[in-house]
Regions:
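A charged, amphipathic alpha-helical module
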Residues: 216-278
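Acidic, divalent-metal-coordinating active-site segment for phosphoryl/phosphodiester hydrolysis
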Residues: 30-45
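Glycine-rich phosphate-binding "P-loop"
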Residues: 1-2, 97-115, 237-252
Length: 564
């Protein structure tokens, strides 16, 4: 057939319509077939850069990502890049303050979204390959993956459940003897009070033992401080004295937990899998012991070699981005920025403590840790992730959605941001605390709030060290606008869409396509209208269309032109 790149199609149109070459305006997005070839024939051209081409010139990271993807393309990854480009890079005139414009939704859609979409598609693949009938997404780290799974694969013949889960919820039900309790005593103790330690580590509250019992072991009251230097012998003696209470409580928690898990069908003989962020398969191992069920698989974003200490059968372990490797490996983003990954994976909810059986089901007991700032940030980020999932589900077939995304490409933008953060974007995480129930009792931020921006100790304790360096060694480049370049240079006889450098007006995403149509309309009408009609169009566009007797022009204005 006739092709643009050879010029045959243009020759046919010119001859068929009996027009001169310079009386034609050709509009297209391909620099070769839509611009260079027709321009060489004397045809007027109007180049509309593709969204993906605009994206490549937005930031160095976007260009590197798009170029790398083009060399390692899979249908699903291509769909993700195209969808992101069409949403955010359809207008080359947009103002570029920073890669994500400090927009948490955009960050979720563009940077974190590909991480979760890739993980979710791989979860499906692993479940099918291992004949897994039920997937159990564990709170809070895989709520966003659970939601994406149900958006992308609503008709799959695999049950998906979201269950409340935490290290605390299984550690106490696993206590069955004094020996188990003494092992817990000799673990690291960070600065706390005796009552808080007994509640967090052994599950018993103040109303279950007296102050007099504490005083036998040099503990004056419930709020007596303890830490790493407090006598382990005295704590061992105290725990032994309280062992009957602790073990009875553990037994009841175990019964409640088994009933809760069974209510979700985990007591089945079929192959099932828990889905979690990672790393050492401790939750998988705990459920195997509590339910006395070996055929529980673990599907993780990352697994470390320590997982084999908990689950010896490696065929039950599945890692997406990292599998059974050293947790200190610098080549994986989740290894170098583990706490940040955990904080952003984690749903906007409080940590699960235990289920309590009631007449109407189960009461879900959660921690009271003040996590409001993180939860507000995560809600917006996760809403961006889910919007990406919805857009993919609405626009692509199951054959595409069933594809694969290389984890390093899925996390490319996210990891780039963590390694070289722009300060304007980094401030999206201002005041977000990292929660560590078993770690030291200090406030550790992803990005310090304003009241601590000059507090060296608080900055030193930031878990995001690259962001901390912005306070210690600020560089001018962190606050300047990103310099943009036009996707293509103007060529002879070509009309460019590039705006004046001084034009600071930022079009809203919803207006981008309307703006583009308006520009195209003006170019066409200025080119082909003559004399009074052209002057009337330029003077009063609305009146020009309303007074026109041309059916095509009137129909165009009614359907399209009147919208802007």
């Amino acid at each position: 057939g006739l092709k643009k790149k050879t010029g045959d199609l243009f020759k046919y149109v010119i001859n068929d319509n009996r027009v001169n070459n310079n009386e034609i305006l050709h509009i297209g997005d391909n620099i070769e077939g839509d611009v260079r070839v027709p321009s060489g024939m004397g045809i007027n051209t109007y180049h509309i850069p593709r969204a993906i081409d605009i994206a490549k010139f937005y930031t160095p990271e976007m260009k590197s990502w798009v170029d790398t993807v083009s060399l390692n393309k899979t249908p699903l990854l291509d769909a993700v890049v195209t969808t992101i480009s069409n949403r955010y890079y359809d207008d080359e005139s947009q103002l570029k303050l920073s890669p994500y414009c400090a927009d948490k939704f955009k960050f979720g859609y563009q940077a974190f979204g590909p991480v979760i979409i890739g993980f979710t598609s791989w979860i499906k693949k692993i479940a099918i390959e291992n004949n897994i009938k039920k997937l159990y997404f564990l709170s809070r780290d895989t709520k966003v993956a659970y939601d994406c799974f149900n958006i992308l694969y609503p008709d799959i013949n695999i049950e998906s459940h979201y269950i409340y889960s935490s290290r605390r919820s299984v550690s106490i039900p696993l206590f069955k003897s004094k020996k188990d309790l003494l092992v817990e005593v000799y673990k690291t103790i960070y600065s706390t009070t005796i009552s808080a330690w007994l509640e967090n580590r052994f599950g018993i509250t103040k109303d279950q033992y007296s102050v007099e019992v504490l005083q036998k072991y040099s503990l004056k009251d419930y709020d007596h401080p303890i830490g790493g230097k407090f006598s382990k012998d005295k704590l061992s003696q105290l725990v032994c004295e309280l062992s009957d209470i602790i073990l009875e409580n553990a037994k009841q928690e175990r019964i409640n937990l088994i009933d809760y898990l069974s209510s979700h069908g985990m007591d089945t003989n079929e192959n099932i899998a828990v889905v979690d962020i990672g790393y050492a398969a401790s939750m998988q191992s705990a459920y195997q012991k509590i339910l006395n069920k070996e055929n529980i698989h673990g599907i993780y974003y990352a697994t470390f070699n320590s997982a084999l200490k908990n689950v010896s059968d490696s065929s039950l372990l599945h890692g997406y981005s990292v599998h059974l490797e050293n947790p200190s490996s610098p080549k994986y983003g989740i290894c170098s920025h583990r706490f940040f990954y955990e904080t952003i994976f984690c749903d906007a909810d409080n940590s699960f403590i235990k289920p309590i059986k009631t007449n109407n089901g189960f009461e879900i007991v959660k921690s009271k840790f003040d996590d409001s700032t993180r939860q507000t940030v995560v809600k917006e980020i996760h809403s961006g992730v889910l919007a990406l999932a919805h857009d993919l589900a609405e626009n692509y077939s199951s054959s595409v959605l069933n594809g694969y995304i290389d984890p390093s490409l899925g996390s490319f933008l996210f990891d780039s941001f963590l390694k070289t953060p722009n300060k304007n974007d980094a401030e999206m995480f201002k005041g977000v605390l990292f929660e560590d129930a078993t770690g030291p009792n200090i406030r550790r931020y992803l990005f310090v709030p304003d009241e601590y921006k000059n507090d060296k100790k608080t900055i030193d304790n930031m878990i995001w060290k690259e962001a901390a360096s912005l306070f210690i060694n600020p560089t001018p480049s962190q606050d300047v606008k990103i310099k943009s370049e036009p996707p293509v240079k103007n060529i002879n006889n070509t009309i460019s869409t590039k705006q004046n450098k001084n034009d600071k007006v930022k079009a809203k995403p919803s207006e981008c396509k309307q703006n583009r149509v308006a520009v195209i309309e003006r170019v066409i009408f200025e080119l082909f209208l003559k004399g009074k009609k052209k002057n009337k169009y330029l003077r009063d566009r609305s009146m020009f269309f309303k007074d026109s007797n041309n059916k095509f022009i009137s129909h165009y204005y009614k359907i399209i032109g009147s919208k802007f």
